[in-house]
Amino acid sequence: MEQPWPPPGPWSLPRAEGEAEEENDLDVFPSSPRCPQLPGGSAQMYSHGIELACQKQKEFVKSSVACKWNLAEAQQKLGSLALHNSESLDQEHAKAQIAVSELRQREEEWRQKEEALVQREKMCLWSMDAISKDVFNKSFINQDKRKDTEDEDKSESFMQKYEQKIRHFGMLSRWDDSQRFLSDHPYLVCEETAKYLILWCFHLEAEKKGALMEQIAHQAVVMQFIMEMAKNCNVDPRGCFRLFFQKAKAEEEGYFEAFKNELEAFKSRVRLYSQSQSFQPMTVQNHVPHSGVGSIGLLESLPQNPDYLQYSINTALCSLNSVVHKEDDEPKMMDTV
């Protein structure tokens, strides 16, 4: 008989030498949180606040992939051209130099925007009034009624159906194990998985389970980078996730640094949001004993995200020729970042 998910019992850190071999061993998952009944529509405002945090997280990852990863591609191309002395390559070399300069400028612009946003959030700490005003002005709150309800139902159904596997992926701690798991379950490479993991991080931090939050945050950023790489390259994400793991395991200069920087920034944002007034009502005492429903209950209560990206980003320097389709036999521990 299938056991209820998540299993009961106190949470603990995953095994030091890797993830748990059996899903039944994973007693680290918290009880399913739910929003308390707060006066004045505060519960709904709380959900909107988390939704806004998810939206901003996607925008940050988008900037990392668009600027930092493309910059690394341009630098690699520039380096390869420098190895040749043929005059016929002079024009190509000049174009590559211009591309590097433009990408560096874009990266600096995004960095300044991110710093300004973080400073503003530290001052405001996401007060209820600020959230209410921000939510009201967001286009995805006032969007047309034409939103496809079938897509919404499909997204909710997906997270309900594959909640166990999404959580299992969240607990993996090796690059090779994560790649192998996605190879066995390619349907998990999607926006719904990324959203579930992001929300899970917020609730873990609200429960004061920082160590577990950092583990899930790593996998959340992994999935986000895969999705943004696919959009950047205009390919199916199920066909390019191996490229991400190839670059991550090789710790290629530029690529891995962009991932580590975004991971640390994401964890900092989660901690910052958890300190805001909008997260204060979400405490451990508001949890109820597990009844087999699963944490998908809160996810279903959130409004569906819109099309996260409103414009396409530079794809000229994106190449998937180096994708490695062969799985490594020997697992390799990921760096603890």
Curated annotation (Swiss-Prot):
Keywords: Chaperone, Coiled coil, Cytoplasm, Phosphoprotein. SMART domains: CDC37_M. The keyword Coiled coil applies. SUPFAM superfamilies: Hsp90 co-chaperone CDC37. Its main location: cytoplasm. GO terms for biological process: protein folding; protein stabilization. Signal peptide: none annotated. One of its GO terms (cellular component) is cytosol. InterPro entries: Cdc37, Cdc37_Hsp90-bd, Cdc37_Hsp90-bd_sf. Residues 278-337 are annotated as: Required for interaction with STIP1. Self-associates. Forms complexes with Hsp70 and Hsp90. Interacts with CDC37, FKBP4, PPID and STIP1. This is Hsp90 co-chaperone Cdc37-like 1. The gene is CDC37L1.
